[in-house]
């Protein structure tokens, strides 16, 4: 009897054993996501039928994208001047909802992308996954667009900071605007390497927005510095891969005779890849500078104050 029950349980459990094609409990999440979104939008948006076309979807043309980003800067810097005379708002509940929503959405985009890219990387290798046209699939294009739209929702981070009278740093404001532009640039440039910085960024954002949610809930978190460290590591990994793809692109275009054993024209426009590399490089330097300023010099000055008091 016990043996039969054990075999029954093992048989049921085996149905949820992860595979390369279905890494999350042997469930193809993309199908469930497609059905859920189709139901929620009453069939108006079906992820499986989506195709990114410049001028067809919201914020798919350069002019409205640049206008939206410009409006973001006008609102936050103009708003900061307007609210100076007002009392800072706490907005605790709104901050909790905002951050919990973004950590959840980031996690959803992340697992859906991992589900799509894991079989490609496993069967064809990393080089294929960052260069070949077949790694730019319809589900990934849909997820890239949804992730891109999320970047405009993240602008609310800064609006909440302004209403709370929090200090705005150059890193924060530059990063938000540049990331929206970066995601758009990679979408229109059809760069196969896009999934690398996007998935790494989503993984960090899951932790980052969870940290913000806990902070908004009044919970003190000891691992705040680790979020910045992870962001720095993320940009380092991004740049290793992106600069390699840019190198391959340049060699394939101008120095065919100097090709490495693996050398092909990686999918994506040269301009999009170069612009992406430039923006990610600026992020790396800015985040390292921020980390030194806040966690290294800040802790050193704190120790000096303690010594003076003693």
Curated annotation (Swiss-Prot):
Residues 1-63, 122-141, 197-201, 256-271 are lumenal. It comes from the Eukaryota. This is Fatty acid elongase 1. Pfam families: ELO. Component of a microsomal membrane bound medium-chain fatty acid elongation system, which extends medium-chain-length fatty acids to long-chain fatty acids. Component of elongase I, which extends 12-16-carbon fatty acyl-CoAs such as lauroyl-CoA to 14-18-carbon fatty acids by incorporation of malonyl-CoA. PROSITE patterns: ELO. It catalyses: a very-long-chain acyl-CoA + malonyl-CoA + H(+) = a very-long-chain 3-oxoacyl-CoA + CO2 + CoA; tetradecanoyl-CoA + malonyl-CoA + H(+) = 3-oxohexadecanoyl-CoA + CO2 + CoA; (9Z)-tetradecenoyl-CoA + malonyl-CoA + H(+) = 3-oxo-(11Z)-hexadecenoyl-CoA + CO2 + CoA. Present with 937 molecules/cell in log phase SD medium. The C-terminal di-lysine motif may confer endoplasmic reticulum localization. The gene is ELO1. GO terms for molecular function: fatty acid elongase activity.
